[in-house]
Every structure is written in structure tokens, then in C-alpha cells.
Amino acid sequence: MPYGNKSKDTILRYSRQIIRFLRTREVKAIVIACNTASAYALDTVAAESDIPIIGVINAGARTAVQATRNGKIGVIGTEGTIGSGIYTRVMKQLKPDIQVTGKPCPLFVPLVEEGLLHDSVTDEIASLYLSVLKGKYIDTLVLGCTHY
């Protein structure tokens, strides 16, 4: 179930439920592989836990900052991930003069789930979303959603 359009409270509730379940399996660590759940729930659930819980945003942000040659990075993701501003915050902590352009792409998730990868509608939607990034001269793009 995509979390991108869920409220912060809902995402936190789901994350806590999943972690409780995983704890019954005696896991040694947990990776929150959803960008939106990492953005909205990671800090809280990690603070509540006695086992390591990590997300995907820090690693993705760090890699993008290391990869960019011109300091201009684009991030696409769900409305939740982009709206949280987490990638911009983390990247600017790593390199304060970095320029980050975020673009929510809410229709990418259902298009991927329906397998509409080579469809004219998909091409139109992708062109519309990504047009915001054109002219920004980004040289690095973060795909900030596990769906794409």
C-alpha cells in the first residue's frame, strides 16, 4: 500500500504496527525502505526502539550530494516525501550550497502498479511532471519512491 498520500499520523501508526510485528520475529535490525515512512516516522520509531531502525533517505541524499558535479539535484517522489522537505534538509546539512528541486509525482505509483510503462498517457504524465526539472540544469536525479 503506497504511503505517499497518507497523513503523518497514519504513517506513524502503520510503522509502529509493522515494527511491533517484526519484533515478534526477533529481528536484529529494521530498514524502513519507504521514503515517505522514512520521512514521517523514522525518527519517532527509532527513538522508541532498542534495536537499530534505519531509513533510506540519508543514504540516498548522501550519494546524490557525492554524485552531483554542478550542485543541482532533482528529487521526485510521492506528495508526502516531497512535501516533508526531508531530502532538501538532509542534503543542505551535507552541503549548504546545494540546490534541490523536488517534484511530487503522485500518478507514477498507480501507473507503475498497473504496468503502464510504455503507454502514451504515461509519457504525457512523465513529461508534465519532469518539465519542472528542465531548465534547472540538474545533473543528478533521486528517485525518492520505492515504486520507481
Description of each model-found segment:
Residues 1-148:
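Non-catalytic structural scaffold of enzyme domains
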